[in-house]
């Protein structure tokens, strides 16, 4: 599963943990949305252009982020790295890309 949306600058972080099917590697990419980004309709159209794209509003982003933190805590993931993930989550203003590698 992978979600993404077009946007501005991108930063990413790789984290290791236990997924539902066993050990796995999670990829979290955060893309911030520029303030004057043009037409919202154009962005949503681009986001829905492929099967792997899904537009995420703030509510869905918050739910996905909370679920990810629960997965990582349940997998005995290091507290230091969870704090790093919390910082990345606070920096996220537009969308998040989440998938397994």
UniProtKB/Swiss-Prot annotation:
Protein name stated in the entry: Putative protein p15
Q: Which gene encodes it?
A: 15
Q: Which organism is it from?
A: Acyrthosiphon pisum secondary endosymbiont phage 1
């Amino acid at each position: 599963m992978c979600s993404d949306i077009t946007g501005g600058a991108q930063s990413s972080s790789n984290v290791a943990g236990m997924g539902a099917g066993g050990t796995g590697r999670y990829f979290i990419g955060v893309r911030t949305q520029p303030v004057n980004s043009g037409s919202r309709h154009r962005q949503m159209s681009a986001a829905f252009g492929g099967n792997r794209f899904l537009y995420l509003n703030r509510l869905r982003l918050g739910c996905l982020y909370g679920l990810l933190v629960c997965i990582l805590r349940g997998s005995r993931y290091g507290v230091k790295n969870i704090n790093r993930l919390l910082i990345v989550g606070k920096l996220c203003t537009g969308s998040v890309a989440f998938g397994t590698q």
